[in-house]
Structures are given as C-alpha cells and as structure tokens.
Amino acid sequence: MPAANAQSRGSYWITTFGCQMNKADSERMAGILESMGYRAANAELEADLVLYNTCTIRDNAEQKVYSYLGRQAQRKRLDPNLTLIVAGCVAQQEGESLLRRVPELDLVMGPQHANRLEVLLNRVDSGQQVVATEDHHILEDITTARRDSSICGWVNVIYGCNERCTYCVVPSVRGKEQSRLPEAIRLEMEGLAAQGYKEITLLGQNIDAYGRDLPGITPEGRRQHTLTDLLHQVHDVSGIKRIRFATSHPRYFTERLIDACADLPKLCEHFHIPFQSGDNDVLRAMARGYTVERYRRIIDRIRERMPDASLSADVIVAFPGETDLQYQRTLDLIEEIGFDQVNTAAYSPRPNTPAATWDNQLPEEVKVIRLQTINALVERCARERNARYAGRTEEVLAEGINPKDPSQLMGRTRTNRLTFFQAAGPDGHQHNPGDLVNVRIDAVRSFSLSGTPLPCVEQR
C-alpha cells in the first residue's frame, strides 16, 4: 500500500520476463512505486507508467521485449505523459543504445539499480532521460516488496555471478556476486512470516556460491558464510513451514549442503541443479567447471540421503561444435538420472560472449530437431517419474484457486509437483489458500497431479 503521506501519482504496470530473480526484482520495484503513491493498473493500456523488466539470456526473449516496446512507444507518441521504463538485463546490456532505438523511453536501468527506482524516477520527473547501468553496490533492505503471493515468497540472498560460462551473458548484465548478510536475510524472512507467509524460496544466480564474498573463516579453516550455514541460521524462523532454494551450480553443491537438506525438516526435497550437457568436452567448452562424473556423484548423494527427492535441471542442445555423439550423451544422462523436469533450450548466441564468435555454429535445422527430440524424452521421463505418486498421500501447500476451475485449489508438494484438488473435501471441509493439505493422488500427468483432499494438516 502507498505510504500515508504519498500523493496519488496514477497507475503502473510491470511486465516481467525471465527468471525468478527478475520476478523478485519486479516485486521490489512494485513496492517502491506504491510507496511513491502509484497504484496497480487493471490493464497495461490503462497504466500511466509502464515498466518492462527484461531478460536477455536468449534472443527470443529479447526480441519479445522490443515487440512490446514498439507498441508502447507508439502509444507514448500520442500520450507524452506516459512514463516508459526498461529495467533488467536487456537494459544493462544495451544501455544508451536503447534510447537510440526507442527514443520514447524515459528510463533505462540495469538490475543492480532496482532499489534506486524512486531516485531515478525523480530525475525523470525533472525532465531528464535517464540511463543507469553503471556498477552499483546493491543497497540492503531499503524497500518493501509488493508480493504477488501472500503464501509463498522469494528472498534474494546473493546477487550477480562470478562464473564465466562461454555462452552466458548474465555476469556482464548482473555484475559480480554480492551476498547479503545472514542477519538481513533472517530479518526479511521473519517479516514475511509475520505477514502469514508459509514458504520461502531463497534466490541466487548461483545460490550455493553464497558467502564467497563475505569475510570470515571458521576455526576449522572453512568459510564462515556458506549456503549450508545460512540454512541452519534461518531454519527456525517461526511460522515458515517450508524452505526452498534456487538455482544451484554443481561446482559448489557440497556433501555438507546435501546433509543439511536431509537433516533440516523445513527444507523441501526438490533440487534444481543445471547440468547443461552430458558430455565432458562440451562442458569444458562451456567453461562449466565440473564433469559429468562430478554431477552424477551429487545426484547419487542426494538420492542416498533423500530417496524420494525430485530433481530438475537446465540443458542446452546444439552448442557450437556439439556432435551427434555428444548430443546422444546428453540424452543418455537424462534417461539415466530420471529427472522430474528439465528446462531445455537450443543454443542462442548472445552478444559479448566467447561462444558467439566461434565458427562451429550448428545450423538452425539441427537445433530444431535436437530440441524436439530432447523435449519428447523430457516429457516421457517426467511422466514416468510422476507415476510413482499415484495412490500416495502428499502434503500440498495450497497456493491459490485453479484459474480453469474455481472449485479447485492448486499448490505444490514438498517435491515441487503442481497438484490440483477440490477445495471442498469429501467430508465437506472447505480448504483455503495457505492451508497445508493431505491430498491422495488420483491422477498423474507429465507435469502435474490431481487428487482428493483428506482431513486438513494445518489451516492458515
């Protein structure tokens, strides 16, 4: 809600492209706008301020942004009072050139500047056309986010990325790693718990690299601040029932972290660990810093400690120079491990990345065929993995109403399976968003489950 002394400044609309980090940034920027007196618009074309929080990890996401911008630029030529903003990774990558391409823009701001939105808008109000893409230390706890959910919340714990994967633009647009202090993270979680939140997902580009930039060494000679230590420090926040984290890098996913996830009861048994390729030579070309054998050991240890854990990953097919045999090894690894879900993408050359300059790019038709083939395998593996839930009773956190059937609630199991069930149980009990519900699984599909609610585990 706007601050008590904030004057109404009209309405705003935010469209978010890309990852969970962007979604969390958008929530913070929405909070800033509402503290300034803006209110959420009912539709984009009704908004007095339009903000696109952008993604540049693949070319198709970037082109979609320009399509949206074209429509709003045309609108602004008819209504000069419209405030038009591009934030996020496209803004960081393109900077001043965005103003040349879309001169109707008022503000171009990289992801490191999300917390500075009010300061930057004040400059816009004074008549400036503003570009903010310089390196900037991310300020701690200066905004209150406007959350899109009142049940599940995101908490950023580390910003940026120090890796140098040859295909990836993230380090150049999100900057170097900046870890938040554990005390600040815990304080934010306590605030969310006080508002009634039940589940928190801790976020970072490489979340298991958390703390590498923070000072301190333990008497045993290891870093004082790690993701494992952070999980222990926030686990007892009263009111929070579930904790997740994403996204992990295999290089930093330690046995100590796995043991903490197995031992701490609030930690959900779901792990998103990208592997990108099932071939070691391709991994070396990508500069990923681990081998397929290392990845297998991580998965083996997870399943040793948490046999029913669900696993998801990211993979890139048709990387420059990828042979048929190397591609087949990726297919074989997916089948061998049996992922619950894999996010797939054909390689997309990105500006200012080494791989984009290589002369062994694969033809588009090869990319299409390899992507179609791997997607069919991923769906089959997901369906086979989901089959194990049939007839079981799973704890589901009801997150909201099924938009396709208002009589149903939808939520996720601890293993992150999307689950639908009737809000009214067979005994007539009415379940509500925020309830933890025991659901008997009656039907399974590739990427979701359906079931019957049993007596409520816990009501909100």
From Swiss-Prot:
Q: Which cofactor does it need?
A: [4Fe-4S] cluster
User: In which compartments does the protein localize?
Assistant: Cytoplasm
Leading EC class:
transferase
Please list the reactions this protein catalyses: N(6)-dimethylallyladenosine(37) in tRNA + (sulfur carrier)-SH + AH2 + 2 S-adenosyl-L-methionine = 2-methylsulfanyl-N(6)-dimethylallyladenosine(37) in tRNA + (sulfur carrier)-H + 5'-deoxyadenosine + L-methionine + A + S-adenosyl-L-homocysteine + 2 H(+)
* Limits of the TRAM domain: 387-455
Report the superkingdom from the record.
Bacteria
Q: Which keywords does this Swiss-Prot/TrEMBL entry list? A: 4Fe-4S, Cytoplasm, Iron, Iron-sulfur, Metal-binding, S-adenosyl-L-methionine, Transferase, tRNA processing
**Which positions bind [4Fe-4S] cluster 1?**
19, 55, 89
Q: Which residues form the signal peptide?
A: none
Q: Please state the protein's primary subcellular location.
A: cytoplasm
For this protein, the Enzyme Commission number is: 2.8.4.3
> Which positions fall inside the Radical SAM core domain?
147-384
What Gene3D superfamilies does the database record attribute to this sequence? Methylthiotransferase, N-terminal domain, tm_1862 like domain
Which Gene Ontology molecular-function terms are recorded? Answer: 4 iron, 4 sulfur cluster binding; metal ion binding; methylthiotransferase activity
Residues bound to [4Fe-4S] cluster 2: 161, 165, 168
How the cofactor binds, per note?
A: Binds 2 [4Fe-4S] clusters. One cluster is coordinated with 3 cysteines and an exchangeable S-adenosyl-L-methionine.
Q: Which GO terms describe its cellular component?
A: cytoplasm
MTTase N-terminal domain spans which residues? 10-126
Q: Which SMART domains match?
A: Elp3
What GO terms in the biological process aspect are recorded for it?
tRNA methylthiolation
Its biological purpose: Catalyzes the methylthiolation of N6-(dimethylallyl)adenosine (i(6)A), leading to the formation of 2-methylthio-N6-(dimethylallyl)adenosine (ms(2)i(6)A) at position 37 in tRNAs that read codons beginning with uridine.
Similarity comment text for this entry: Belongs to the methylthiotransferase family. MiaB subfamily.
Subunit annotation: Monomer.
What HAMAP family does the entry give? tRNA_metthiotr_MiaB (MF_01864)
Q: State what protein this is by name.
A: tRNA-2-methylthio-N(6)-dimethylallyladenosine synthase
Q: What gene name is listed for this protein?
A: miaB
